[in-house]
Swiss-Prot record:
Residues 198-330, 371-384, 441-513, 638-647, 697-720, 778-817 are extracellular. The gene is OCA2. One of its GO terms (biological process) is melanin biosynthetic process. This is P protein. GO terms for molecular function: chloride channel activity. It comes from Homo sapiens. The lineage of its organism: Eukaryota, Metazoa, Chordata, Craniata, Vertebrata. Glycans are attached at residues 214, 218, 273, 442, 781.
Amino acid sequence: MHLEGRDGRRYPGAPAVELLQTSVPSGLAELVAGKRRLPRGAGGADPSHSCPRGAAGQSSWAPAGQEFASFLTKGRSHSSLPQMSSSRSKDSCFTENTPLLRNSLQEKGSRCIPVYHPEFITAEESWEDSSADWERRYLLSREVSGLSASASSEKGDLLDSPHIRLRLSKLRRCVQWLKVMGLFAFVVLCSILFSLYPDQGKLWQLLALSPLENYSVNLSSHVDSTLLQVDLAGALVASGPSRPGREEHIVVELTQADALGSRWRRPQQVTHNWTVYLNPRRSEHSVMSRTFEVLTRETVSISIRASLQQTQAVPLLMAHQYLRGSVETQVTIATAILAGVYALIIFEIVHRTLAAMLGSLAALAALAVIGDRPSLTHVVEWIDFETLALLFGMMILVAIFSETGFFDYCAVKAYRLSRGRVWAMIIMLCLIAAVLSAFLDNVTTMLLFTPVTIRLCEVLNLDPRQVLIAEVIFTNIGGAATAIGDPPNVIIVSNQELRKMGLDFAGFTAHMFIGICLVLLVCFPLLRLLYWNRKLYNKEPSEIVELKHEIHVWRLTAQRISPASREETAVRRLLLGKVLALEHLLARRLHTFHRQISQEDKNWETNIQELQKKHRISDGILLAKCLTVLGFVIFMFFLNSFVPGIHLDLGWIAILGAIWLLILADIHDFEIILHRVEWATLLFFAALFVLMEALAHLHLIEYVGEQTALLIKMVPEEQRLIAAIVLVVWVSALASSLIDNIPFTATMIPVLLNLSHDPEVGLPAPPLMYALAFGACLGGNGTLIGASANVVCAGIAEQHGYGFSFMEFFRLGFPMMVVSCTVGMCYLLVAHVVVGWN
């Protein structure tokens, strides 16, 4: 803070004061505690010569050279402030359009700063009215400033007109009102539809099947039913054996009359056969479903016969239910719901968490309408709590870890290793993330890397968004290299029948590792090409960037405070005043600062010395505790994949590690740690799991798999393997960029296995599984919600004030996905078609 004249130049003898203390000064604290108002000034110079009138009741004005705390203290007895009126100012120039913060007050060459205080209200004003007036003026000021900042130079003159600004403000409020009312009407409609249809549940029948007798039952059809769903539970396997006819199986026959029958011709009997193979391990149970089309309203007959090698009976559970709506109708509804969710996220109409919740509600309402409404217990079972536990535990670990200053230390070390070369640092970070994600879960990798990257970019005055997007893309690529790097790979390797074909851990990892290395060699130059015309450095100096970020954080803090009490209202008003004061300072710095930043830091040696003094380890003892616990957690992650005797999954390991560190760190204020947890990200994943399972019940994923199999069968035999690899890679990539790759992979494995077992097709299973792995893992880079690591990275970045939108990720992620899938497809074609590595 300094004194300036009318021409904007500093006075040579004026003292320069730098305000670094962010806490409330002592004088202001005493004034708040005493609940006093500044009295009328009796002595001193007349303030009207240097400060304007008409600001009483909302702000007071202090000379810039006077000490802030002493100014408030002296104001009690002999203040030189303007006279406080007992009512609102009647000055005609003080209206709703009057700015709360004046940029410069030139009167006799001096400058004043505004001092906001929640006690500067008159006796006739209520606290709530004053607070509402403050926030109304604050929002109006923000709206006008936002319009001014976003306007181009050509439109600046038009936007300066109050009439244009008023019309734009009314239009914005109208669009906002239409959005809220439209979404509210949609939610009410879905809620009504969901409540009209009851949860019928499934009535399971216990059957004892033997090769000596069959089981049969007659079902009466419903009037409005078009589908019949039959569920079987027991020792079943989803896919058929490699050599059909030699395994134990059961055959479900569904017989009904043809709808084309008339009174002159007897209706023909139509029989649907469903063959289900039994698991040799009778203790492993699973549930399988099959949907049949109901042709008429006549009685439907179900017959079940078993083909067993022994005469011992096999227990089996069976349930059935009628559904409304054909498969094509359900797929159309599911596609519309998925498109609506993506529209809400792409155009940022609502937050992505709320968009996923709206999509889940719409999908549940659609299931209720067709007659398959799930119970609350069933919906909760759809949520993958292992993933949520992993996220929650690692967020707790990272929150405590950040208190040690380790992330700042790592940022300085990375800056030293790169020797000031930005692209060398970015490639190094992406390569380390790719290698680490090959052995760790992608979510864990981004939870550890995102805070370090953000701090490093702040030190180097880089835009963290661009670096984080590149980092998470290479994390997803590196996760596809091993059998434990990505969930689709784990699902493929865990299949017992695929293990018999040679797709074990070592074979799968060796095959995928070669292909991913080729993908990395192509994607690193592509990343440089895509960022060729993008400015990774911030356009403003680091001081301006930090000030903007500070304003953003203060504004978010003020918005999160709910004014439920008088004290909270006072704090909220103080925070809003802080935001306005910082915006005034930002406007001055933007007006005076002009600096051109080169693409390479020439003075990196000088900067590294300053950074090492500024960014050090703040708590060495806590750092040792964090490194011990985190190292043990990562070691258990590795051990869990290779040692079957450890009965802990990733979620349990992360939760236990978080509890250990909470005890060792001796955390007393637990709420501070909970504030660091990304609850919006956890809710987004929970809603996304429900949405994907509901879409699977609407036959969307099954329909995609069946259509892919039909396209492969249509290709001539000599070109069928080429077509199968190409189709599976691209269908998996596009589907995984839109929906969760875990249920898609679990659905596609039986489809591809049945396709390979079909003697008319004659395709080997390993190339299809490798194509599925490449597409499902690399396809997650296509969109922001295509992979779990993308959502986690975006959530942490948003918590730090550097959130990126769907389109910002899409501009880089989708081209990288297309190129990486193309390289992976070419590798599979050479390996399995040319070389014959099957």
